[in-house]
A protein has these predicted regions:
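Conserved P-loop NTPase
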Residues: 1-5, 9, 190-225
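Edge strands and adjacent loops of beta-rich recognition modules
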Residues: 4-11, 15-20
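P-loop NTPase catalytic phosphate-binding loop
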Residues: 15-181, 185, 202, 223
């Protein structure tokens, strides 16, 4: 794995380009095998735990290069760079309406047994995002996170490790996600269960995250600083 992973190096890799073509999201390079670690939108929702908003913004940039439709719901003030490939909704009135529409669509699609992937919904900085949401919108959003993937809407939730202290319905569903990337040490969070935690966990070096799937964590090198 290169000492520093640059955008030019990462995006020029054949495996990364192939992942994007297949509708996958390349997350980074496995530190042991150097293979590209990817996320499949219809293979289980994804949680991103980080203390830094700059890393959330970098992850949003990574998502914007994908082929699939991506909708980002974000607090009014955020660090996301605008990109024509991605719809960013940061006006509370607009996202309340959008959440209601999507939850209804999921309902209709599931009744019609239409399970094809439509779009990936990204909740940017969740803890701040839901602060001003009405209870009805929170309930709809929790429904989207819980059932959306079957109805064609996969979810990525970006949030801080203090998610474990949140008791709202949206956070409760996000905490149950089986896949996660973490910019923090396993020891420094209690949201994601990890069974192969190292005895003496070192500080994470720059550009190193954990990718957790089915309670097993592997280190990956990422573009998020």
């Amino acid at each position: 794995v290169p000492e520093e992973l640059t955008e030019a190096d990462f995006y020029s890799r054949a495996s990364v380009q192939a992942a994007y073509k297949q509708g996958l999201v390349p997350l980074g390079l496995d530190m042991e095998t150097v293979e590209t670690v990817t996320w499949k939108p219809c293979g289980g929702n994804l949680l991103y735990l980080t203390e830094k908003e700059s890393q959330m913004a970098a992850f949003a940039r990574l998502l914007s290069r994908g082929k699939q439709k991506t909708i980002i719901l974000a607090p009014q003030y955020n660090e996301i760079e605008s990109d024509e490939n991605v719809l960013v909704v940061n006006n509370p009135d607009e996202y309340e309406e959008l959440i209601a529409v999507i939850s209804q669509k999921i309902d209709e699609r599931m009744k019609a047994k239409n399970f094809d992937h439509v779009a990936t919904l990204v909740l940017y900085n969740l803890t701040e995002l839901i602060e001003k949401m009405s209870q009805e919108t929170r309930d709809n959003l929790a429904y989207i996170l819980d059932k959306g993937e079957r109805g064609g809407y996969a979810s990525i939730v970006m949030t801080v490790p203090s998610l474990n202290r949140q008791i709202d319905p949206v956070s409760a569903v996000a905490k149950s996600f089986k896949k996660a990337i973490m910019a923090v040490r396993i020891t420094d969070q209690t949201v994601v269960a990890v069974n192969n935690k190292p005895l003496r966990e070192q500080l994470l070096e720059e550009q190193i995250h954990y990718y957790v799937q089915n309670t097993i964590a592997n280190k990956i090198k990422v573009l998020m600083y």
